[in-house]
């Protein structure tokens, strides 16, 4: 591993190592286990690849949101499953709409101009009406950390052509399919009180006994 030119990106859990030349791959594979072991880590090495659009880091892949501007975007399948689920207890319709507003604002900040994602978070904002997020909807220490790091902020905007093509290359959803999904989100409605759903009606046994709202 020593002497091999590379770029390393890590978050304490996942790590990506990028090499400038595929010919260096064999040298890297020969030394990576020992190199990490010297620092006290037993490292699991996954498959390598040369397709930049399939580079995966913390369940995100690179999307060219504007020509020359890249953004790591969450996997839509896992992201939407999580973004539809609330761990905040709702006692009223206002609680529900306040939660929708919080998710909308957070989603806009990280993916407002990303295909499919932007449309979902815009729909949440529309459904929230005039509700305002509650303090317990925010992870304040994380927000402060992001501010100190100077993390960028995105805004709702129509996805660019490059974003649609890049999103397709990363996740296999064609530009036409993206627009159809966005149309579905634009028609999304909610109701109160929530209805109980069982695992037989949704994808995921962990949802047994969870509650959802009409129309989602």
Name what the model sees in each region.
Residues 1-2, 39:
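Secondary-structure transition/capping motifs at alpha-helix termini
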Residues 2-20, 59:
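Catalytic palm active-site di-aspartate
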Residues 7, 27, 101:
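Short, glycine/acidic-rich beta->alpha junctions
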Residues 18, 38-39, 61, 138-141, ...:
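Short, well-ordered coil/turn residues at beta-beta hairpins
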Residues 21-81, 106, 116, 123:
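Polymerase palm active-site segment centered on the conserved acidic dipeptide of motif C
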Residues 69-109:
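Conserved NTP-donor binding/palm subdomain of two-metal-ion nucleotidyltransferases/polymerases, i.e.
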Residues 95-216:
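C-terminal, non-catalytic extensions of nucleic-acid polymerases
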